[in-house]
UniProtKB/Swiss-Prot annotation:
CDD domains noted in UniProt: SAICAR_synt_PurC
Source lineage: Bacteria, Bacillati, Bacillota, Bacilli, Bacillales
The protein's name in its UniProt record: Phosphoribosylaminoimidazole-succinocarboxamide synthase
Pathway where it operates: Purine metabolism; IMP biosynthesis via de novo pathway; 5-amino-1-(5-phospho-D-ribosyl)imidazole-4-carboxamide from 5-amino-1-(5-phospho-D-ribosyl)imidazole-4-carboxylate: step 1/2
Stated family: Belongs to the SAICAR synthetase family.
Length: 239
């Protein structure tokens, strides 16, 4: 498989065409951004870590029957994935109060929720990726009610698999963001990535943060935090 011309470049990844109409080539970048791109930095090794961690987690999900776009890891920073039409919704599942939800509800960060909360955010940089209701989604016409139901169900299923998997590594899955795509056959499958860029991950005992909050809040060395997650998941750390 060959990497051809660049199709798209986002904050964290570049997407390239391949000679297969059904596949695209993903390259993870070393860029870190926060606050809708207002805070930016190049962090050497971050792309490798996100690629390695996403590979491990997508393989885990595929093992239990969850359909994803992941095909294979091509290098330390690259992977081959199925081409899909991305649904312009970020699906956020929350198990513990943190970040914007803690502020929105006026409740203490770290409060464990009795059951997970699923939220939808409209993917639009100009609007700041706003929180939307199912009624808003219908007005925006970006997903049908049936698709929204599938997104919610898949998010909750993935959540339970990841909660258990991270718990075995002594990590608490606080919350995480997913993106989904539609195949040419009309099936909804998991796309994008699952990494410390898209999850809040805390040590189950100390609540030490191993995610992008380290960068957002200037809590320490980002690559050290991501390396710790990779090590606990059984990947090969470069520390």
């Amino acid at each position: 498989m060959q990497k051809l011309e660049l199709l798209y470049e986002g904050k964290a990844k570049r997407i390239y065409r391949t000679e297969s109409a059904d596949m695209v080539w993903v390259e993870y970048k070393d860029s870190a951004t926060a606050f809708n791109g207002e805070k930016k930095e190049t962090i050497t090794g971050k792309g490798r870590l996100n690629n390695e961690i996403t590979t491990l987690l997508f393989r885990k999900l595929q093992e239990v029957g969850i359909k994803t776009h992941f095909v294979e890891k091509l290098s330390e920073t690259e992977q081959l994935v199925k081409k899909v039409s991305i649904i312009p919704l970020e699906v956020v599942t929350r198990n513990v109060l943190a970040g914007s939800l803690s502020k929105r509800l006026g409740m203490e960060e770290g409060t464990v929720l009795a059951e997970p909360i699923v939220e939808f955010y409209f993917k639009d940089d100009d609007l700041g990726d706003p929180l939307v209701t199912e009624d808003h989604i219908r007005v925006l016409n970006v997903a049908s009610p049936e698709q929204v139901s599938v997104l919610r169900d898949m998010a909750l299923q993935i959540n339970q698999v990841l909660i258990d998997h991270f718990a075995s590594c002594r990590v608490r899955l606080v919350d995480f963001k997913l993106e989904f795509g539609v195949t040419d056959e009309g099936a909804i499958i998991l796309a994008d990535e699952i990494s410390p860029d898209t999850c809040r991950l805390w040590d189950e005992t100390s609540n030490e943060k191993f995610d992008k909050d380290v960068f957002r809040r200037d809590l320490g060395n980002l690559t050290d935090a991501y390396e710790e997650i990779l090590k606990r998941l059984g990947g090969i750390s470069h520390v």
